[in-house]
Every structure is written in structure tokens, then in C-alpha cells.
Amino acid sequence: MKFRFNGASNVELNNREIELTREEVEGSSIATVGDALRYLFGKYAETRDSFFDHHGELVHGTICIINKMDWEILEKERSPVKHGDHIVLISTIHGG
């Protein structure tokens, strides 16, 4: 499972990919994108400030794309995922 990040407030996270191994996905019982995001939040601290609020939820203004489909037209947090899937998080909130 690969995560890609765009528009992050953390410059080092911008355009970065994080890949979870099959063992991580299956061993952590990751079945939905919500599970995957919680795992990511817990393991990779640098994702927290740019994409998650203090409850571990995606911040307002973040677009989540699962295998080229907006999660808004899927099942959002309940969308099923598996090893090999691609998830893109895009922050649309920018200072100005």
C-alpha cells in the first residue's frame, strides 16, 4: 500500500511516498482506509501536523484519493483497502 502526499504544510512531506509492506497491512489488520490512516498517523509522526487533527481524523480541506477515486464517492473511511492500493492525500488549505 502506497501513500503519496501533496500540499503538506511540512515541506519534507510534500511529494513524498510512504509504502506499507504486505506484512504491515496484513499484520495490523488494515481493512479500510480509516484503519490505514490511523496506522499511518501512529507510525509516521510527520503526517500528523499536515493531514490529521488532534482526534486522528483527516483535517478539513484534505482530499483523499484511493486508487484514482475520490473517497467521497466511495465509502470514505469505511472504503476497503488492501496491499497494493494507492492512496493520495492532498491538502487544499493554504495560508495567504
From Swiss-Prot:
UniProt-recorded name of the protein: Ubiquitin-related modifier 1
Location in or out of the cell: Cytoplasm
Function according to Swiss-Prot or TrEMBL: Acts as a sulfur carrier required for 2-thiolation of mcm(5)S(2)U at tRNA wobble positions of cytosolic tRNA(Lys), tRNA(Glu) and tRNA(Gln). Serves as sulfur donor in tRNA 2-thiolation reaction by being thiocarboxylated (-COSH) at its C-terminus by the MOCS3 homolog UBA4. The sulfur is then transferred to tRNA to form 2-thiolation of mcm(5)S(2)U. Prior mcm(5) tRNA modification by the elongator complex is required for 2-thiolation. Also acts as a ubiquitin-like protein (UBL) that is covalently conjugated via an isopeptide bond to lysine residues of target proteins such as AHP1.
Recorded family membership: Belongs to the URM1 family.
InterPro entries (alphabetical): Beta-grasp_dom_sf, Mopterin_synth/thiamin_S_b, Urm1
Organism in which the protein naturally occurs: Encephalitozoon cuniculi (strain GB-M1) (Microsporidian parasite)
Gene: URM1
Keyword tRNA processing: yes
Keyword entries, A-Z: Cytoplasm, Isopeptide bond, tRNA processing, Ubl conjugation pathway
